[in-house]
Curated annotation (Swiss-Prot):
Coiled-coil blocks: none
Substrates-to-products reaction catalysed: L-citrulline + L-aspartate + ATP = 2-(N(omega)-L-arginino)succinate + AMP + diphosphate + H(+)
GO biological process: argininosuccinate metabolic process; L-arginine biosynthetic process; urea cycle
Binding site for L-aspartate: 134, 138-139
PROSITE patterns to which the protein is assigned, alphabetical: ARGININOSUCCIN_SYN_1, ARGININOSUCCIN_SYN_2
Domain of life: Bacteria
Protein known as: Argininosuccinate synthase
Organism: Neisseria meningitidis serogroup C / serotype 2a (strain ATCC 700532 / DSM 15464 / FAM18)
Amino acid sequence: MSQNHTILQNLPVGQKVGIAFSGGLDTSAALLWMKLKGALPYAYTANLGQPDEDDYNAIPKKAMEYGAENARLIDCRAQLAHEGIAAIQCGAFHVSTGGIAYFNTTPLGRAVTGTMLVSAMKEDDVNIWGDGSTYKGNDIERFYRYGLLTNPALKIYKPWLDQQFIDELGGRHEMSEFLIANGFNYKMSVEKAYSTDSNMLGATHEAKDLEFLNSGIKIVKPIMGVAFWDENVEVSPEEVSVRFEEGVPVALNGKEYADPVELFLEANRIGGRHGLGMSDQIENRIIEAKSRGIYEAPGMALFHIAYERLVTGIHNEDTIEQYRINGLRLGRLLYQGRWFDSQALMLRETAQRWVAKAVTGEVTLELRRGNDYSILNTESPNLTYQPERLSMEKVEGAAFTPLDRIGQLTMRNLDITDTRAKLGIYSQSGLLSLGEGSVLPQLGNKK
């Protein structure tokens, strides 16, 4: 194997090392360890509007206590909202089960974090970056790509790829004892039956007990909504309206939001009251191994439902088909950490220009429990849905007449004749059996 000089396998002593600092056990122990071993750690914390984070301002202070040369809090929420809306506009969601999608909320968060934190590091002349991603996951590749896109001179140092760090602090217990031994009164939190990663757009629950498919969604405690499967949790039906202007969500229940962050937070509150957007997915990681996750995304789900309702009422069939096909392709690129690659930008621009621009209107829904909802009304000045065209009643100025339909059907004789000839060829070659007892018995009936 050729040596990758971009990835440093040993601690760069005496050099500035940026670390994506969450304030949790792993990054706290890593920061202190790097400091004691002679590196110059700089801490960067992304404010992504995580629903399970109470006090962002306390995180950089904690980093300084653990020995950071400097610690910065980077507000990434506006950019995250922007990318979330772009994903909605493009339908960039390729993982789904039974029609319920995973809204790629973690990949969107990584695209924002990976670019904005490395950009902040460049301002501080920090060109070595570390984060908490493991070698078996997706994030190690996502951060690698986004980091190098932002700073081509970037070097990567991850304590979790450094054998010395692993030998000395290989587990949560060792990390906790290390902090205590160095004078920090660190109380290790009780481990959950799964791990959680979240941002303003959604939450991911995975690993540990959730690696076993006989552990279902019921072991998860939602952080963005309610446990809708629990009959003891009261969930009342609720009507909600969502308004789009040129593909951008701008209003909820008639109230306009100039700040997309506030819009998302309110959408999360509305959808969360019902457990909307929760899903259980088996997916293929970038390395092709399968993993399983339980996901929450109440606001993304609400916007997606309303947006697609308008798309189907405004655009023609071929446009909708291309929107869906391109959305699947773009969703996979986003998942792989290629959200800013040229092939992804091409697909994004196509959807945002030719699909989203026409999506203006308002959709009213009734939300119930989980992903159970009904669409109550759809309004748009751009609707091509015109029921009078297909009315079963006698109408003046009809779009077409019975005679027109006869002509249209007669034209179909051309391809019907061609199709019948093809079926005969397949029969003669043994690919298709015609006649009595076959899948197409009527075609072989010469009586």
